C-alpha cells in the first residue's frame, strides 16, 4: 500500500470548514466520500491545515494511504476529480514516504488575504474578498507587521477556544497593492493558531485606517490578551495559499 499526497484547491463558500463533522458539508467529508466511491472502502485523510467555514484554499495539502498499488498518481488525480463536486479540485497527486504527515512535516504555510478598497461593491467578488471601501495606509501597515515577524506569544491573536501553545513563528508578512483596488496581505509561518491570520489582518487594518499607530502592534502583542487586539476579519477574504515541506 503506497502513501500519496494531493494538492487541493476549493471554494470554501458552501462548506462548514475543512475538518469533517457529522451532518454538515465539509471539505474533508466530500474528499473522503469521493475516495470511498473510488476504492470501495473508507479512506481517512490528514491535512496540512483546518480552514474555517468560508475560507478558501489554493494549495491545501492532504495525504492518505492508497489501497490500489496499480493506480498511478495521475489515475488517482483523475478519479478524485471525477468524483468530487465542482467546488473542489485536485491539482496534483504524488507519492510520499510511508510516515509522511502533512500537519507535522510541513515547514511553511502561506496564507493570502484579499481586501477590496474600492468605493463601489463588486457583487461577483463578495464571497472572495473583504470589501472595505476605505483608504488604507499600507506603509503604516507594513511597519506594524514588522512587530509580528519572528517568534512570539500570539495569545492576543488567537480565539479563546484554542488551547494550544500560543508561541508561533511568523517568517514574513508582505502587504501589496494590486490592480483594481485590491490589497493583498501575505502571511508566511510554520503554523498558526485558530483564526490567527484573520485576527492579524483586522489589527493591521486598524493601523491602515490610522486608528492605531504602527507601534500599537507591539503593545497588543506583548499584552497577551485577546481583548487588547481588534476584531476578526471576515473568513471569505482568506486563502490557504501554499505549503512547503
From Swiss-Prot:
Per UniProt, the enzyme's principal EC class comes to: isomerase
Source organism per entry reads Thermotoga sp. (strain RQ2)
Q: InterPro entries attached here?
A: PsdUridine_synth_cat_dom_sf (IPR020103), PsdUridine_synth_TruA (IPR001406), PsdUridine_synth_TruA_a/b_dom (IPR020097), PsdUridine_synth_TruA_C (IPR020095), TruA/RsuA/RluB/E/F_N (IPR020094)
Pfam (any one): PseudoU_synth_1
NCBIfam families attached to this UniProt entry: hisT_truA
Quaternary structure note = Homodimer.
Please give the biological process terms from Gene Ontology that the record holds. tRNA pseudouridine synthesis
Residues annotated as the enzyme's active site? 52
Put simply, this protein is called tRNA pseudouridine synthase A
Enumerate the catalysed reactions: uridine(38/39/40) in tRNA = pseudouridine(38/39/40) in tRNA
Q: What is its EC number?
A: 5.4.99.12
Isomerase is among the record's keywords? yes
Amino acid at each position: 500500500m503506497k502513501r500519496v499526497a494531493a494538492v487541493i484547491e476549493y471554494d470554501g463558500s458552501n462548506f462548514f470548514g475543512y475538518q469533517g463533522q457529522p451532518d454538515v458539508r465539509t471539505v474533508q467529508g466530500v474528499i473522503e466520500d469521493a475516495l470511498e466511491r473510488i476504492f470501495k472502502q473508507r479512506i481517512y485523510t490528514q491535512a496540512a491545515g483546518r480552514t474555517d467555514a468560508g475560507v478558501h484554499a489554493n494549495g491545501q495539502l492532504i495525504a492518505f494511504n492508497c489501497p490500489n498499488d496499480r493506480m498511478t498518481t495521475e489515475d488517482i488525480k483523475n478519479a478524485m476529480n471525477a468524483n468530487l463536486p465542482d467546488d473542489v479540485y485536485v491539482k496534483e497527486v504524488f507519492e510520499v514516504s510511508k510516515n509522511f504527515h502533512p500537519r507535522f512535516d510541513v515547514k511553511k504555510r502561506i496564507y493570502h488575504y484579499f481586501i477590496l478598497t474600492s468605493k463601489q461593491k463588486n457583487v461577483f467578488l463578495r464571497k472572495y474578498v473583504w470589501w472595505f471601501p476605505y483608504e488604507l495606509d499600507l506603509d503604516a501597515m507594513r511597519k506594524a507587521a514588522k512587530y509580528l515577524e519572528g517568534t512570539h506569544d500570539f495569545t492576543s491573536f488567537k480565539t479563546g477556544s484554542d488551547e494550544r501553545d500560543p508561541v508561533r513563528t511568523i517568517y514574513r508578512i508582505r502587504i501589496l497593492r494590486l490592480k483594481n483596488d485590491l490589497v493583498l496581505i501575505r502571511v508566511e509561518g510554520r503554523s498558526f493558531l485558530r483564526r490567527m491570520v484573520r485576527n492579524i489582518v483586522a489589527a493591521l487594518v486598524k493601523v491602515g485606517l490610522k486608528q492605531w499607530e504602527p507601534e500599537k502592534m507591539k503593545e497588543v502583542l506583548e499584552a497577551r490578551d485577546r481583548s487588547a487586539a481588534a476584531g476578526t476579519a471576515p473568513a471569505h477574504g482568506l486563502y490557504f495559499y501554499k505549503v512547503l515541506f
